From Swiss-Prot:
DNA bind region: 240-261
GO biological process: adhesion of symbiont to host; biological process involved in symbiotic interaction; cell adhesion; cell growth mode switching, budding to filamentous; cell migration; cell morphogenesis; cell-substrate adhesion; cellular developmental process
Annotated protein name in UniProt: Enhanced filamentous growth protein 1
Protein location: Nucleus
Biased composition (Polar residues): 123-153, 384-394, 420-435, 514-544
Family: Belongs to the EFG1/PHD1/stuA family.
Biased composition (Low complexity): 342-383, 395-416, 476-502
PTM annotation: Thr-208 is a phosphorylation target to promote hyphal induction by a subset of environmental cues. Phosphorylation at Thr-181 by the CDc28/HGC1 complex represses cell separation genes and leads to hyphal chain formation.
Gene name per UniProt: EFG1
Keyword Transcription: yes
Source species: Candida albicans (strain SC5314 / ATCC MYA-2876) (Yeast)
Residue ranges annotated for the HTH APSES-type domain, each copy included: 206-312
GO cellular component annotations of the record: chromatin; nucleus
Annotated segments matching region Disordered: 17-48, 72-95, 123-182, 329-435, 476-550
Length: 550
């Protein structure tokens, strides 16, 4: 027989059903279902002749059984064998091929596991135990967690274990890296961040400033879910009872949480929104973050809440880090309670209305157009204020657009965008250094040829409309430009300009005849308009250029 047996050849073609040791007749029936083998028992030579005949007929019909034809089509070697000897020899052949196939399978499986272990970073390159059954010779029974070794105990890139795997205890220095970095404001009071809460989108700050007469301190009151939450200005403590009422918590759970607080101050007398258990700022912020009501209570948890009341804008992170060093020293000791007059100075942009009631004078101020009653009850009145109209020049809103034009734009664009600066800078004069620098920068940026801009920096004659708004004198001193104005806007043609320069006779100074000009530029005829000193200088330079051309 040949070196390839029938089941191994079928396995090479992907047919795994014939891998078990079988008799020759059964193998022939499964390999060739078209040909029916005789199942009658007879002598071996008769079966071999029939098998050879059917194999020859099948070889004509099916082109892929050449191995089977070569194996069964040699009757000279097999004529002396009985059926039992042939079956035993074939079983030995199959057993040999089956063992060699398993011998080849397991190194491939372990190399596959090592390949996955090498591709995953920070994994230990240990051999992975492969749970392959010997009967399954295909790769469909691969374990589901093959890319992740089950016995990996390595480094910070820990992956969550699969359901079938056992979680490995992580060393303590690694477990600290796994936890998300907590917000520092909830941990220590002297943290570097002084913001505490950023402005959520679409929400304007609504704060009412009241005076707590019994405690001689100022209070900041924010309403949410028809509950007024108050924060003291002297030690930044917050009414925890009202805070948890905003979260619509039950009374038993609320009291249980507040009783477990170590630092608390119980207030039993006073107005409705002042009664309750007062807790520190950090604990209140942690509770609000846990109950997800921080955005509803904006700007109660902004650390520098006075700036929010004055400007109406949360201080940004840059200003917060700059002010952190200044406030870190004062954060250790609580500031003294400010006098009632200080309320008017701190809330500069807000309207302060005093009203007499049972508690005495209560100062209530609303910021950002809110209309919320003050601490005294029904007797106090508040006045809505538009903070944008009330801001002074010292606040960031007053000179916002002015600084935007001065600082945000680069200096090279300032001569075209900021009209208030053109009278002071010599940028509008022809041949100045800023024009040359601007054109050089444009040539460096876009890789233009320098000779393409010849004369452009000198007299700006090729692009009159580009310089018209700040330099109207060119349009009047060179009247021949206006005839081809539309063509020059679309495509500056140097040949047309050279032809016009030959035909036209420019008279130096301002043009003596009227010119059809664009609506952006007033017509400058001689004696009609008193030109500015810049126009005088430009006219003189234009006349010198005209003389040089002559």
């Amino acid at each position: 027989m040949s070196t390839y047996s029938i089941p191994y050849y079928n396995q090479m073609n992907g047919n795994y059903n014939n891998g078990m040791p079988q008799q020759t007749t059964a193998a022939n029936q499964q390999a060739f279902p078209q040909q029916q083998q005789p199942t009658t028992t007879g002598n071996a030579s008769q079966q071999q002749q029939q098998a050879a005949a059917t194999a020859a007929a099948a070889a004509v019909q099916q082109p892929y059984n050449y191995m089977f034809y070569q194996q069964q089509g040699q009757p000279g070697q097999q004529t002396g064998q009985t059926a039992g000897q042939q079956q035993q020899q074939q079983q030995q052949q199959q057993q040999y091929d089956y063992n060699t196939y398993n011998r080849y399978q397991y190194p491939a499986a372990t190399s596959q596991g090592n390949y996955y272990q090498q591709t995953i970073p920070n994994q230990l390159s240990q051999p992975q135990p492969q749970h392959y059954n010997g009967s399954n010779r295909n790769y469909t029974s691969a374990p589901s967690g093959a890319p992740i070794p089950s016995n990996s105990t390595s480094g910070p890139s820990q992956q969550p274990p699969l359901p079938g795997q056992q979680a490995v205890p992580i060393p303590p220095h690694v477990s600290t890296m796994q936890q998300p970095t907590p917000v520092q404001d909830t941990l220590n009071a002297s943290s570097t961040s002084t913001v505490g809460q950023f402005q959520p989108p679409g929400i304007r700050p609504r704060v009412t400033t009241t005076m707590w007469e019994d405690e001689k301190t100022l209070c900041y009151q924010v309403d949410a879910n028809n509950v007024s939450v108050v924060r003291r200005a002297d030690n930044n403590m917050i009414n925890g009872t009202k805070l948890l009422n905003v979260a619509q918590m039950t009374r038993g759970r609320r009291d249980g949480i507040l009783k477990s607080e170590k630092v608390r101050h119980v207030v039993k007398i006073g107005s409705m929104h002042l009664k309750g258990v007062w807790i520190p700022f950090e604990r209140a912020l942690a509770m609000a973050q846990r109950e997800q009501i921080v955005d509803m209570l904006y700007p109660l948890f902004v650390r520098d809440i006075k700036r929010v009341i004055q400007t109406g804008v949360t201080p940004n992170a840059a200003a917060a880090t700059a002010a952190a060093a200044a406030t870190a020293t004062s954060a250790s000791a609580p500031p003294p309670p400010p006098p009632p007059v200080a309320a008017a100075t701190t809330t500069a942009a807000t309207a302060i209305s005093k009203s007499s009631s049972g508690n005495g004078n209560s100062i209530s101020a609303t910021s950002g157009g809110s209309n919320v009653s003050g601490a005294s009850g029904a007797g106090s009145t508040t006045s809505p204020v538009n903070t944008k109209a009330a801001t002074t020049a010292g606040t960031p809103q007053g000179n916002y657009y002015q600084t935007y034009n001065q600082q945000q734009y680069p200096q090279q664009y300032g001569q075209y965008n900021a009209p208030g600066k053109n009278q002071n800078t010599p940028a509008s004069q022809p041949g100045s250094t800023t024009n040359d620098q601007y054109l050089q920068q444009q040539q460096q940026m876009y890789g233009y040829q320098s000779n393409y801009y010849q004369g452009g920096a000198a007299n700006s004659s090729y692009y009159p409309n580009y310089y018209q708004q700040q330099q109207p004198n060119y349009a009047s001193s060179y009247p021949y430009q206006q005839q081809q104005q539309k063509q020059q806007q679309q495509q500056p043609n140097q040949q047309q300009q050279s032809d016009q320069q030959q035909t036209s006779t420019p008279s130096g100074g301002a043009g003596t005849r009227s010119v059809h000009q664009s609506p952006q530029v007033q017509s400058l005829t001689q004696g009609s308009v008193h030109p500015s000193p810049q126009q005088h200088q430009a006219n003189q330079s234009a006349s010198t250029v005209a003389k040089e051309e002559k």
